Amino acid sequence: MGGSNALNEMTNGSDGITGGVADVYGEEFATQDQLVTPWSFSVACGHSLLRDPQHNKGLAFTEKERDAHFLRGLLPPVVLSQELQEKKFLTTLRQYQVPLQKYMAMMDLQERNEKLFYKLLVDHVEELLPLVYTPTVGEGCQKYGSIFRRPQGLFISLKDKGRILELLRNWPEKKIQVIVVTDGERILGLGDLGCQGMGIPVGKLSLYSALGGVCPSACLPITLDVGTNNQKLLDDEFYIGLKQKRATGEEYAEFVQEFMSAVKQNYGEKILVQFEDFANHNAFELLEKYRTTHLVFNDDIQGTASVVLAGLIASLKLLGGTLADHKFLFLGAGEAGTGIAELIALEMSKKTKAPVEQMRKKIWLVDSKGLVVSSRKETLQQFKLPWAHEHEPITTLIDAVQAIKPTVLIGTSGKGKQFTKEVVEAMANINAKPLILALSNPTSQSECTAEEAYTWSQGHAIFASGSPFDPVEYEGRTFVPGQANNAYIFPGFGLGLIMCGAIRVHDDMLLAASEALASQVTGEHFIKGLIYPPFKDIRKISAHIAAGVAAKAYELGLASRLPQPADLVKFAESCMYNPTYRSFR
């Protein structure tokens, strides 16, 4: 072949060019102190094709494909269908007893055979979602240093300040549509995991592709490593990040500013940047700072708010009345709690035509120091001030429940076992059907379990949680707990922004997403006490959410893809990534 002759001339000739396989500086011949060139071929075939996760089909390569791409002899003779590969992998996966082992097996598959990974996720989402995302991903992040095998995503550290654009250009895929970025300071309910928080952007983008149909090659997970204040990690010899305390203040702000500018310069105006698991003090500031200049979305603030609002809208079929007829009490006044509260107030304002400020008075927050009230204004963080209402100080949740008498209790505290028997019983005494949402992740940090909610309320509670719980048998009835999982919202929300070429995120798009999700809950679901539709229908749900978001973007003049498609649901479905194997020439 001409290519091999050229390579021979280059490596064996006397023109001084080095780095070829046969050259003294080639990897097989060079001594440890000599430099080598990592040669590779651009066209994947043979051995390299089997190690290319985007194109590898494993034993599903046909006889014709094996001959055409030099795979003959590199694989056992059997040819399997993708369906049989799914069955084989699931059989092996189900033999593992430890969820972390299953998580690692799924991550290995993603690095080996991308299409099979996503086909499995799409076809078995209810079984596999808890493995690739909450709650198992939390343990995966905690142990990321010791289970780290191949790098996934882009790691940008303080050492790279001044070169971030160069790092973005190192990423092999050029047509990026969505970035999920974290600085690892508040990973789920687990705190500061530093660089090991990369498991979250990787997991989130897996769901963008599996549930929302965004092409995997258009997704970029990024960790901004600004250090960690977790002493355990700093002392861990296997920790993969910068071993220094977190950068703060001006140093941090300049670093993030360079990153955001580089992203826009490299990928353009319509690149979606999702902020993920930033600490409260940074999350609000970053969203506020960049929402007018970039297409940005914070899932912890906006995604959580949208999915919870959807559950509340759907629950009205069970509770009766309108949102404005209810009273809400939050345990937790951080980014999730205040984000949900603000979207609820906005929705009530839109429906009643009353000012948002008036609607906020129906919503009460409890933080670590007690009920958020006006007498505490001097010491409250800025984002809590809109929720500081006139009331005498109250320090405990049970006293707040008895004083406020809420119809809806929402937990976003990040601390487990906060909804005690006394609290749940009080909610059941106040309401015929108390709505209890224990949203903190992972499962160990949930404010109460499904069994506790149903048992302590004597079967009267309508319950949903952030992490999954099994159905509960109580006095001859089977209660199916709902899961207020952000995965209902953000994949379809992102697809909607991408498919219409949105240039900014508007709060009305979040309301549209909530209403689209709530519309997918049917009478059959309500009979079971569900306020969210089953996850098995997630691609259909995502298409409707995407259509709702895109329609609102067109209405607000924030969409750049023109003309507007006639049927946005069908258009969303046509845009979705298909993980079924393609035939090769």
From Swiss-Prot:
Tissue expression as described in the entry: Leaves.
Binding site for NADP(+): 329-345
E.C. code: 1.1.1.40
Alphabetical list of Gene3D superfamilies matching this protein: Malic enzyme, N-terminal domain, NAD(P)-binding Rossmann-like Domain
GO biological process, one term: malate metabolic process
Protein residues bound to a divalent metal cation: 276-277, 300
Range of residues in the leader sequence: none
Record text on cofactor binding: Divalent metal cations. Prefers magnesium or manganese.
Disulfide-bond pairs as recorded: none
Alphabetized UniProt keyword annotations: Cytoplasm, Metal-binding, NADP, Oxidoreductase, Stress response
Site label Important for activity, positions: 300
Named cofactor requirement(s): Mg(2+); Mn(2+)
Principal location listed in the UniProt entry: cytoplasm
PROSITE patterns hit by this protein: MALIC_ENZYMES
Subcellular location: Cytoplasm
Reaction equation(s) it catalyzes: (S)-malate + NADP(+) = pyruvate + CO2 + NADPH; oxaloacetate + H(+) = pyruvate + CO2
Induction of its expression: By salt stress.
Source domain of life: Eukaryota
InterPro entries to which the protein is assigned, alphabetical: Aminoacid_DH-like_N_sf, Malic_enzyme_CS, Malic_N_dom, Malic_N_dom_sf, Malic_NAD-bd, Malic_OxRdtase, NAD(P)-bd_dom_sf
Binding site for NAD(+): 186, 300, 441
Function: Plays a role in CAM (crassulacean acid metabolism) photosynthesis.
Record family assignment: Belongs to the malic enzymes family.
Protein name, per record: NADP-dependent malic enzyme
Organism: Mesembryanthemum crystallinum
Lineage of the species this protein comes from: Eukaryota, Viridiplantae, Streptophyta, Embryophyta, Tracheophyta
